[in-house]
Amino acid sequence: DTPMASGQPLRLMSNAVNRITVNGNLVGPTQRISAERALRSVTIDAAYSLRKEDEVGSIVPGKLANFTVLTENPLTVSPQSIESIEIWGTVHEGRVLPIP
C-alpha cells in the first residue's frame, strides 16, 4: 500500500475544512467538514484506525502524554490559516520539548 494523503495533520485538516487544491480550485464544497471534525480525524479517529485509541489520540488520564503543541488554536483561526499554524514543540511521554 501507498499512502493516499499527506502525513502532515495540519495539511490534512486544512484540506478537509477548505477543499481547495494546490492550484486554488474548490473541489467538492459540499464535502467540507468543520475544524472540530477535522481535528478528531487526525487525533482520536486516527488512533482508532490503528487500534490504539486506548493509548493515544486524546489528552486524558491514563494515555501516553504524546502530542504536538501549536502556536495557535486550529479551532479558532480562520479555516484558510490552519495549514500555516506553526509548531511550538512537542510533549513526549510527559516531557516538554520546545523546538529550539
Q: Predicted segment positions?
A:
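His/Asp/Glu-enriched, well-ordered alpha-helical/loop segment
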Residues: 1-76, 80, 85-93
